[in-house]
């Protein structure tokens, strides 16, 4: 267990919580700049830790909400940053509706690698409450979220996130600026939920995406025929692999399959491989 010293405090980084504390002061300021937050916004920080990002946010915001699960770090932040509203709890369990009562939330955070996916999908599920999310996550995951068709990184995570959010990969962060030093690099991404959901049946779409990418090397026909009536989909389309289709094209295919299921397959689906 690695003990991290900051000012008057020695706190052991807890491996089970995936704690890696950011030591560099310039990176948090860059994260805040990229987030675009301004005074008056409803800002929520996930896991302030020793307050590197907290301090940078306070240069812009006189007060905001931070959610910290670790009891020792929650106590530290109450003492070090009394102007913030500190919620000592797990972000995955905190109700977001009350926090967004005054406006949509701008979420920032240095996210533990071990719970990146649960946090991302919690934000996605609550996208109607979110103005933006600017997050530092594992570099490999950031690449997968921002991936484009035809690349090895492009898959379920990219499609599910990009279908409902505008996603931007901002910059890479080397592992040397953390203590304890992680085994991998990090990166900062920004996600902004789309003003209008392009898919009404979001749960059905998630299931569809998991199915089309279940076996990446198989064609759409082979991945879908067990679950959907594909009779109204042009044969050239069914010969494609999911990894070759853009997010809008996959949304169009899903919509067409739902029309076919309802017996309303008017018109033919026109899908083109991304060049």
From Swiss-Prot:
The keyword RNA-binding applies. S-adenosyl-L-methionine binds at residues 20, 22, 47, 68, 90, 110. Its EC number is 2.1.1.182. InterPro entries: KsgA/Erm, rRNA_Ade_diMease-like_C, rRNA_Ade_Mease_Trfase_CS, rRNA_Ade_methylase_Trfase_N, rRNA_adenine_dimethylase, SAM-dependent_MTases_sf. It is an enzyme of class 2 (transferase). It catalyses: adenosine(1518)/adenosine(1519) in 16S rRNA + 4 S-adenosyl-L-methionine = N(6)-dimethyladenosine(1518)/N(6)-dimethyladenosine(1519) in 16S rRNA + 4 S-adenosyl-L-homocysteine + 4 H(+). It is found in: Cytoplasm. Keywords: Cytoplasm, Methyltransferase, RNA-binding, rRNA processing, S-adenosyl-L-methionine, Transferase. Specifically dimethylates two adjacent adenosines (A1518 and A1519) in the loop of a conserved hairpin near the 3'-end of 16S rRNA in the 30S particle. May play a critical role in biogenesis of 30S subunits. Belongs to the class I-like SAM-binding methyltransferase superfamily. rRNA adenine N(6)-methyltransferase family. RsmA subfamily. This is Ribosomal RNA small subunit methyltransferase A. It comes from Chlorobaculum tepidum (strain ATCC 49652 / DSM 12025 / NBRC 103806 / TLS). The lineage of its organism: Bacteria, Pseudomonadati, Chlorobiota, Chlorobiia, Chlorobiales. The gene is rsmA.
């Amino acid at each position: 267990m690695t003990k991290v010293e900051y000012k008057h405090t020695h706190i052991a980084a807890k491996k089970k919580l995936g704690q890696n504390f950011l030591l560099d002061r310039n990176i948090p300021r860059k994260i805040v700049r990229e987030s675009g937050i301004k005074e008056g916004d409803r800002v929520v920080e996930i896991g302030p830790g020793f307050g590197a990002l907290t301090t940078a946010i306070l240069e812009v915001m006189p007060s905001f909400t931070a959610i910290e699960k670790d009891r020792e770090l929650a106590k530290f932040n109450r003492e070090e940053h009394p102007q913030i509203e500190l919620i000592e709890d797990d972000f995955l369990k905190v109700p977001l509706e009350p926090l967004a009562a005054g406006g949509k939330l701008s979420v920032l955070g240095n996210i533990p690698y071990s719970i990146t996916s649960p946090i991302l999908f919690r934000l996605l599920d609550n996208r109607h409450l979110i103005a933006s999310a600017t997050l530092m996550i594992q570099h490999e995951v950031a690449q997968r979220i921002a991936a484009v068709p035809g690349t090895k990184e492009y898959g379920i995570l990219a499609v599910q996130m990009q279908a409902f959010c505008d996603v931007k990969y901002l910059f890479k962060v080397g592992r040397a600026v953390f203590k304890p030093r992680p085994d991998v690099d990090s990166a900062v991404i920004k996600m902004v939920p789309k003003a209008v959901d392009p898919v009404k049946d979001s749960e059905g779409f998630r299931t569809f995406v998991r199915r089309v990418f279940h076996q990446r090397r198989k064609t759409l026909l082979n991945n879908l025929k067990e679950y959907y009536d594909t009779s109204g989909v042009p044969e050239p389309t069914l010969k494609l692999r999911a990894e070759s289709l853009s997010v809008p094209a996959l949304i169009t295919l899903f919509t067409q399959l739902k029309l076919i299921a309802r017996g309303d397959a008017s018109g033919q689906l026109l899908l083109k491989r991304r060049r």
